[in-house]
Amino acid sequence: MAEQEEKQTRRATAARKTQETDITISISLDGTGSSSIESGIGFLDHMLTSFSRHSGIDITLQCQGDLVVDDHHTVEDIAIVLGGAITEALGEKRGIRRYGWAMIPMDEALARCAVDLGGRSCSVFRAEFSRPLIEGLSTEMVEHFFTSLAGSMNANIHIAILEGRNTHHKIEAIFKAFAYAMKDAIKVEGNAVPSTKGVF
């Protein structure tokens, strides 16, 4: 019963307002993968919608960013706020698997992602993109998104593209691999903190 009650409360809302962005994100870790994403960047909306669907995490995201400058502040701050919301929703992380990994194909592209939610912030990203921009998103910001997310979540995120040519396919495979890795890592299997320390 206690485990069920904890799962039902794994929801959070996080916000950030600066002179560059105004962002509010609400999530439910035990959702159905439904989402409403309005980042102002079409391709980022597509990727976050895909992440929500495949992870099972419900996400509502509203962002007003200084896109007249570029997409840097918007992408970075969305990652910071999303990471904060996930951290808050996880609470003490009792009973979670903690670790998750996935290898996902998207046509000729193949992405691998491994996640550790144990409180140690680290991001390793190995991918190259032939296009500098795709549907409003600077492809160099994909790595920065996951670096910022790992820092905000205090998570260890390893991402690598093993095969691929098409930029769209490679980035979409990355977000889907991250989704399935997170889906595993946040699963509740008991009530203990998954660490020999007893705490994170």
Swiss-Prot record:
Subcellular location: Cytoplasm
UniProt xrefs under Pfam families: IGPD
GO biological process terms, semicolon-separated: L-histidine biosynthetic process
InterPro entries for the chain: IGPD_sf, ImidazoleglycerolP_deHydtase, ImidazoleglycerP_deHydtase_CS, Ribosomal_Su5_D2-typ_SF
Pathway noted in the entry: Amino-acid biosynthesis; L-histidine biosynthesis; L-histidine from 5-phospho-alpha-D-ribose 1-diphosphate: step 6/9
Domain of life from the UniProt record: Bacteria
Cellular component GO terms held in the UniProt record: cytoplasm
EC code(s) of this entry: 4.2.1.19
Keywords tagged on the record: Amino-acid biosynthesis, Cytoplasm, Histidine biosynthesis, Lyase
A molecular function GO annotation: imidazoleglycerol-phosphate dehydratase activity
PROSITE patterns from the UniProt entry: IGP_DEHYDRATASE_1, IGP_DEHYDRATASE_2
Keyword Amino-acid biosynthesis: yes
NCBIfam families: PRK00951.2-1, PRK00951.2-4
PANTHER family with a match to the protein in the record: IMIDAZOLEGLYCEROL-PHOSPHATE DEHYDRATASE, IMIDAZOLEGLYCEROL-PHOSPHATE DEHYDRATASE HIS7
Family affiliation: Belongs to the imidazoleglycerol-phosphate dehydratase family.
Protein name: Imidazoleglycerol-phosphate dehydratase
Organism: Chlorobium phaeovibrioides (strain DSM 265 / 1930) (Prosthecochloris vibrioformis (strain DSM 265))
Lineage: Bacteria, Pseudomonadati, Chlorobiota, Chlorobiia, Chlorobiales
